[in-house]
């Protein structure tokens, strides 16, 4: 699968229920690591690990390439605050990018930022990545073998 690809995403905050977060990463060898921590109603941390096929890794690269997020800069994005923070780190080929911003509640937050075009690219990419990861985790851990 090559060592030219890595992705990590984190979103979280520290509040009345402690440190609540969602984090996932795809490693160069195809390992998907997922963690979801919510202390709401004494919930426990969910940790899952699975290996994904190289075709999934290729699709992930395609999604990132199509988004053109590697052309963006987070300098004008809202900084992390008491509401929370998001981090996205991607290594793809020779490029290594890292973004940090506050939690984004909706497109209204995006449109009111100092860089709505760039933040919109980030926002939609994160939505796509979360959807893919939730689907992979759900399918991998809920399917019953025959």
Curated annotation (Swiss-Prot):
Biological role stated in the UniProt entry: Core component of the splicing-dependent multiprotein exon junction complex (EJC) deposited at splice junctions on mRNAs. The EJC is a dynamic structure consisting of core proteins and several peripheral nuclear and cytoplasmic associated factors that join the complex only transiently either during EJC assembly or during subsequent mRNA metabolism.
InterPro entries hit by this protein: Mago_nashi (IPR004023), Mago_nashi_sf (IPR036605)
One Pfam family, short name: Mago_nashi
Nucleus as UniProt keyword: yes
Subunit details: Part of the EJC core complex that contains casc3, eif4a3, magoh and rbm8a.
Domain of life according to the entry: Eukaryota
One of the protein's GO biological processes: mRNA processing
Lineage per the UniProt record: Eukaryota, Metazoa, Chordata, Craniata, Vertebrata
Gene Ontology MF term list: RNA binding
Entry keyword annotation includes Nucleus: yes
Protein name according to UniProt: Protein mago nashi homolog
């Amino acid at each position: 699968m090559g060592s030219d690809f890595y992705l990590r995403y984190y979103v979280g905050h520290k509040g009345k229920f402690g440190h609540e977060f969602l984090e996932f990463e795809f490693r160069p060898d195809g390992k998907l690591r997922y963690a979801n921590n919510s202390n709401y109603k004494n919930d426990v941390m969910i940790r899952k690990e699975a290996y994904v096929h190289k075709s999934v890794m290729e699709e992930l690269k395609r999604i990132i390439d199509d988004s053109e997020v590697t052309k963006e800069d987070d300098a004008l994005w809202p900084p992390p605050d008491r509401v929370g923070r998001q981090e996205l780190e991607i290594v793809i080929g020779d490029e290594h990018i890292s973004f940090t911003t506050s939690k984004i509640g909706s497109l209204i937050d995006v449109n009111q930022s100092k860089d709505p075009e760039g933040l919109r690219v980030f926002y939609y990419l994160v939505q796509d990545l979360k959807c893919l990861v939730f689907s992979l985790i759900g399918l991998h851990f809920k399917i019953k073998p025959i």
